[in-house]
Amino acid sequence: MIVLSLFDGISCGQIAFERLGITFDGVNNVYIASEIKKNAIKTTQLHYPNTIQVGDVCKLHYDSATNALYKDCVFKDNKYYLGEKVIDGKPDIIIGGSPCQNFSSLRATNGLAIDGLRGDKSKLFYEYLRLLKEIEPKYFLLENVKVKKQDKKMLDNYLDVEGILIDSKLLTYQTRARYYWTNIPNVTVPEDKHISFQDYKDTNIERCKESSPNRTPSRITMWANGNGGDNKTCKNITHADKVGCLSTKQDRAPNSGMIQYGDWCRYLTRREMEQAQTLPIGYCDHLSYRQACDVIGDGWTVDVIKHIFNFIPWEEMKCQK
């Protein structure tokens, strides 16, 4: 089985496959990752060294004439000039979460327009769509934020399936509503596991210290003695059951929430962020706190992806468990 993961990040998709008993040795089962962020690639290769990294999605091309996938291709004069061959044959499954900055409601919070599919970042969706049409895999999965109604309709039409809205809070303590477009049959919304942040709150002194920022005027405003600032964009989650949606930066407003720490506050620790995304504990211990925030916030909630993959008719797939 060949899986092509576009905008792979830290390989949350690969973790989900692993939890279903499917591992990638690079021979029988092959996992190809398109990613350009160095810390994300570093994390993936640390945990999954058999992953084939292919770089920029814009330079990937499946050539039907040779029945092979190529990287570092050049598109010129309305055709592709082939680069280095990655693998013979075509992927059985394509997965990915194209960058969502232009869809995100955070743009409106920061006074920016929600550009949808017209935005520079979200235009990478069309690269996903291009490869989907070139390869025509058996199954595909696309994840994105909760988009506007008109953008949702456009994406439904482009992908010829209706996106399913699943909130990560059903399977973890993080509120993270996302749309998932897939042709995997009969996917349903998972049942609520009623998981509370209070059962996972980190008490490790070093990790809590690491996530407690220095006092500055802007951070004092964000915390506002636990009142979350004037516009309540930084919620006090000290006693909350759920935390806000993880983003790539905790040190900003809005964020996932702030926690009372002594006479001051802290952000989520790296352990709390990992568990909010149902990542393996310690998955990002090799990174700095800020680097961990970046790649974890960019990632998927693994157990949501596992839930979706569980509906794949595995008896039809050429994979080894």
Stretches with model-predicted labels:
Residues 124, 128, 277, 289-293, ...:
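Catalytic phosphate/metal-binding cores of nucleic-acid and nucleotide-processing enzymes, i.e., regions
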Residues 1-9, 33-34, 93-97, 245-247:
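Short, hydrophobic/glycine-enriched beta-strand segments
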Residues 15-19, 46, 130-133, 307-310, ...:
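Short, well-ordered alpha-helices that flank and scaffold nucleotide-derived cofactor binding pockets
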